[in-house]
């Protein structure tokens, strides 16, 4: 009987609408043909999303079954801002290792094995940073995320400097291992703590749908960022050269990280204001 009740509580039409909206939104960014016509799906995605929101409000009001996502979760500032931060952050950070692989293979002529090994120190530092941040997020709150983004952003700026100096002065490309080490360290201190803080104020009965919304924002940000940033790098590299083209790509990532930092600072300010009341 419990299984039957669970099946009856599902929202198949809402699931279909949201699935089609996400598909229409992501397809132009992941379609390898690069046809501009695929971007005509974006208005369709907006229309489908609007239809889904209207349907979810109808389900909430008439209560034939549970809505997929109760829009009440968006009344929590920590959830709204944390989800925004995750989407913007993933739009930038996930493209870094793609750019590193492209630069070392296409720009410098190294093998895929060597290009992949560049990120090993960063991966190790990320695991230690994640452990460190996880133990402190309960006490320090959003400051952990702010510090992580700041460290990662510092690494990105130094990576841009290393790329420019490599082109201008012949500085060894292996300095990037050190700058990317900072990026990895910061990265490890952001993702887990942000998820914890984003969902901390959400009631348990909203936990499943809230986590799904957060993960969807991350996946959409990743798809958009990879398409946008790699397109910028390929266009810049053809027009200029690989070092400066890659530097422009890292500059784009840094801009997105700066936006994520502003969101984190704003959320931290709201939390401090609520605590002071």
Where do the PLM segments sit?
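12-transmembrane solute porter fold
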Residues: 38, 63-272
């Amino acid at each position: 009987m419990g299984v039957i009740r669970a099946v009856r509580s599902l929202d198949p039409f809402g699931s279909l609408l949201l699935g089609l909206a996400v598909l229409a939104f992501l397809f132009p960014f992941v379609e390898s043909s690069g046809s501009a016509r695929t971007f005509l799906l974006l208005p369709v995605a907006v229309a489908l999303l609007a239809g889904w929101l209207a349907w979810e409000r109808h389900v909430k009001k008439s209560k034939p079954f549970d809505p997929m996502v109760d829009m009440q979760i968006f009344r929590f500032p920590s959830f709204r801002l944390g989800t925004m931060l995750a989407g913007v952050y993933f739009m930038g950070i996930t493209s870094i290792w793609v750019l590193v692989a492209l630069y070392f293979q296409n720009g410098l002529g190294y093998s895929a094995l060597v290009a992949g090994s560049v990120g090993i120190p960063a991966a190790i530092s990320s695991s230690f940073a994640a452990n460190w941040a996880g133990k402190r997020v309960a006490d320090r709150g959003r400051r952990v995320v702010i510090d992580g983004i700041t460290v990662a952003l510092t690494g990105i700026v130094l990576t841009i400097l290393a790329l420019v100096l490599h082109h201008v002065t012949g500085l060894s490309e292996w300095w990037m291992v050190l700058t990317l080490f900072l990026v990895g360290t910061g990265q490890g201190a952001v993702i887990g703590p942000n998820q914890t803080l984003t969902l901390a104020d959400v009631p348990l009965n909203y936990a499943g749908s809230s986590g799904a919304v957060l993960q969807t924002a991350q996946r959409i940000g990743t798809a958009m960022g990879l398409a946008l940033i790699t397109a910028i790098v390929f266009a810049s590299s053809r027009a200029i050269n690989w070092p400066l083209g890659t530097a422009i790509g890292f500059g784009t990532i840094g801009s997105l990280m700066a936006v994520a930092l502003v969101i984190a600072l704003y959320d931290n300010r709201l939390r401090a204001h609520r605590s002071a009341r």
